[in-house]
Amino acid sequence: MARNEIRPLVKLRSTAGTGYTYITRKNRRNDPDRLVLRKYDPVIRRHVEFREER
């Protein structure tokens, strides 16, 4: 209920174009913009930026 409104599940897709995704929760109050995190992409075996997908 309220949990899903404040902290929705978001998909983080790799900017390397591999199609690899992470799924996480984000706090809309603290991060109203699209989330960008630098995480490991096991397909290309490198750290790359992952952007929030809507």
Curated annotation (Swiss-Prot):
InterPro entries: Ribosomal_bL33, Ribosomal_bL33_CS, Ribosomal_bL33_sf, Ribosomal_zn-bd. It holds the Pfam family Ribosomal_L33. GO terms for biological process: translation. One of its GO terms (molecular function) is structural constituent of ribosome. The keyword Membrane does not apply. It comes from the Bacteria. The keyword Ribonucleoprotein applies. Gene3D superfamilies: Ribosomal protein L33 (2.20.28.120). GO terms for cellular component: cytosolic large ribosomal subunit. Keywords: Ribonucleoprotein, Ribosomal protein. Belongs to the bacterial ribosomal protein bL33 family. This is Large ribosomal subunit protein bL33A. The lineage of its organism: Bacteria, Bacillati, Actinomycetota, Actinomycetes, Mycobacteriales.
